[in-house]
């Protein structure tokens, strides 16, 4: 193995190039390309995600707006009826029919149940219970001084409620329930004990009790979910209720029942063109009221954990979206209903939709690009590795002697010149040994050139194993070698040369199958400390001259001076 001293003053670029070879450069470039392609794909995914969320909100918003407008129409009607009653309380009409109704009330108020009706074709009947029934609870009272005005106002409400009925409305029933023991409803009641049970059912409902001044100080519309068993089909309903007040006195409650079936039918009609997703309507306690799923299909209901997560998000904003497992749920609060409308979009629907197709295509493109990139990386990495190996091999062949595996003459002179310059600047010793194998020509003549090659290779191995780690050695001629000893004085160089001479002389070489041969070497030594000259060619020339003196003096010896002061060892 050749020995080489690493120079401390090598540039940072060469050190970096030595640490990061072509393979590292290729790896880094491909890693950067893959990183940027992944970031670009991720950016596209984020844009696609935002577009998907916006699409979900747009679909939900369109249905929510239609439902909200329909509910607003019903709420406006309820407020209109409340305002009409309020005006009738403040300025009652002086019609004889109304006065006659008041008189009839005074006559019938003690009855267990009673009914007042002005005109069956134009107004709705008024139903009531006895004074004794009203006196049973503190919630009800007939002590109002405006009882007569409330009675006539309720009869006027019957006229308005009949006129305001429309097939486009969602409501099943509109009613006014008074704290004074009577009620009016768009659904007729058979005359009899059903009047008492129905009034009792009304005044015990949450939508009536919760409208007291203490429980509803804002006096606005409130929504309630209830099942009313007296209805023939016993269907589930939501009820909007609005209190009637005047001069800080609570007269009663105007209410409107909306069947859940009507809301379901409306949702299905509104979402019939939207083949993806399912709409669900929840009340203010996140209880499912209805959904747009077909009758033969099971709704995608939320479990308790998902409902809790959704409730936490709804508290933060009036609309938004949330990923719950394989479902994406977008939600929006309704302006005219105390609840929230949800759109549930499953993963399967998402994959089958437009955004799913785009996502799959984008994923396949990224996978294809990444696969091509990895294949290209492997091919180029293999090519670069082979080229790097070939380059190193060619460089090694250009700098080394293939037989002895030491530096050739050109490489040795180049490296030695750089070392000499460095040690001259550092004012450190620098020595050179010139070595020649004795009688080498006779080995070629007697045993052939193959034997000569074995001798050269054997001698080079002994030289390389004897010199120090930072010394360098090279073959400069046929059987001639040069050894550069940076940092070695002339005395140290002489010791090293002596070790080399002894090892070469002591080892026998097998030149043929049955013949061994012992060789010797003559050496000349020069050192920069003699004349202060660090020019390598001059030092090598001086060592070569002293090598000639050693051969003239009998071979197998070392010459370290110009004439007679050579040291001889046998």
Curated annotation (Swiss-Prot):
Q: Binding of Mg(2+): at which residues?
A: 436, 479
Annotated InterPro entries: CHASE7, Diguanylate_Cyclase, GGDEF_dom, Nucleotide_cyclase, Rev_trsase/Diguanyl_cyclase
State where substrate binds: 444, 449, 453
Q: Which GO terms describe its biological process?
A: cell adhesion involved in single-species biofilm formation; cellulose biosynthetic process; negative regulation of bacterial-type flagellum-dependent cell motility
Q: What is its EC number?
A: 2.7.7.65
Q: Where is the signal peptide?
A: none
Q: Where is this site: Transition state stabilizer?
A: 441
Reaction equations catalysed: 2 GTP = 3',3'-c-di-GMP + 2 diphosphate
Enzyme class, one word?
transferase
Stretches that traverse the bilayer: 20-40, 360-380
Q: What does this protein do?
A: Catalyzes the synthesis of cyclic-di-GMP (c-di-GMP) via the condensation of 2 GTP molecules. Cyclic-di-GMP is a second messenger which controls cell surface-associated traits in bacteria. Involved in the regulation of cellulose production.
- Know the name of this protein? Probable diguanylate cyclase DgcQ
Q: Its encoding gene is what? A: dgcQ
């Amino acid at each position: 193995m050749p020995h080489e001293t690493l120079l401390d003053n090598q540039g940072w670029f060469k050190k970096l190039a030595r640490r990061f070879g072509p393979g590292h450069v290729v790896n880094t470039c491909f890693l950067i390309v893959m990183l940027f392609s992944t970031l670009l794909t991720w950016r596209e995914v984020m844009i696609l995600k935002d577009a998907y969320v916006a699409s979900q909100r747009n679909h939900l918003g369109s249905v929510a707006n239609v439902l909200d407008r329909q509910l607003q129409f019903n709420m406006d009607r309820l407020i209109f009826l409340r305002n009409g009653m309020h005006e009738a309380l403040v300025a009652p009409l002086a019609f004889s029919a109304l006065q006659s109704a008041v008189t009839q009330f005074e006559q019938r108020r003690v009855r267990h149940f009673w009914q007042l009706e002005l005109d069956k074709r134009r107004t709705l009947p008024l139903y009531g219970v006895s004074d004794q029934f009203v006196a049973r609870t503190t919630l009800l009272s007939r002590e109002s001084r405006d009882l007569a005005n409330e009675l006539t106002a309720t009869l006027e409400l019957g006229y308005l409620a009949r006129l305001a009925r429309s097939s486009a409305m969602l409501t099943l029933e509109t009613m006014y329930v008074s704290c004074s023991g009577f009620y009016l409803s768009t659904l007729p009641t058979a005359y009899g004990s059903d009047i008492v049970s129905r009034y009792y059912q009304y005044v015990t409902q949450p939508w009536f009790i919760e409208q007291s001044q203490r429980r509803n100080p804002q006096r606005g519309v409130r929504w309630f979910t209830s099942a009313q068993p007296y209805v023939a089909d016993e269907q589930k309903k939501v009820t909007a209720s609005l209190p009637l007040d005047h001069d800080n006195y609570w007269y009663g409650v105007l209410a409107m029942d909306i069947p859940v079936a009507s809301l379901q039918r409306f949702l299905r009609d509104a979402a019939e063109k939207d083949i993806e997703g399912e709409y669900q309507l929840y009340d203010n306690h996140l209880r499912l009221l209805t959904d747009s799923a077909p009758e033969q299909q099971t709704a995608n209901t939320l479990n308790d954990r998902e409902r809790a997560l959704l409730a936490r998000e709804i508290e933060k904003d009036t609309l938004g979206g949330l990923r719950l497992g394989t479902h994406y749920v977008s939600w929006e609060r309704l302006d005219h209903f105390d609840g929230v409308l949800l759109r549930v979009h499953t993963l399967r629907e998402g994959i089958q939709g437009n955004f799913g197709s785009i996502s799959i295509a984008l994923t396949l493109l990224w996978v294809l690009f990444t696969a091509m990139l990895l294949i290209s990386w492997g091919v180029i990495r293999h090519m670069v590795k082979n080229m790097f190996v070939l380059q190193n091999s060619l460089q090694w062949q250009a700098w080394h002697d293939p037989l002895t595996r030491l530096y050739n003459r050109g490489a040795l002179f180049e490296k030695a010149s750089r070392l000499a310059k460095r040690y001259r600047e550092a004012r450190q010793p620098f020595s050179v040994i010139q070595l020649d194998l004795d009688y080498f020509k006779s080995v070629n003549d007697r045993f052939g050139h193959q034997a000569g090659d074995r001798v050269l290779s054997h001698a080079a191995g002994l030289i390389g194993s004897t010199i120090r780690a930072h010394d360098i050695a090279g073959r400069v001629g046929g059987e001639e070698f040069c050894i550069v000893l940076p940092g070695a004085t002339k005395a140290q160089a002489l010791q090293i040369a002596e070790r080399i001479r002894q090892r070469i002389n002591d080892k026998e070489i097998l030149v043929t199958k049955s013949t061994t041969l012992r060789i010797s070497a003559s050496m000349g030594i020069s050192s920069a400390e003699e004349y202060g000259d660090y020019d390598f060619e001059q030092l090598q020339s001086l060592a070569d001259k002293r090598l000639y003196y050693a051969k003239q003096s009998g071979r197998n010896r070392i010459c370290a001076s110009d004439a007679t002061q050579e040291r001889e060892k046998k």
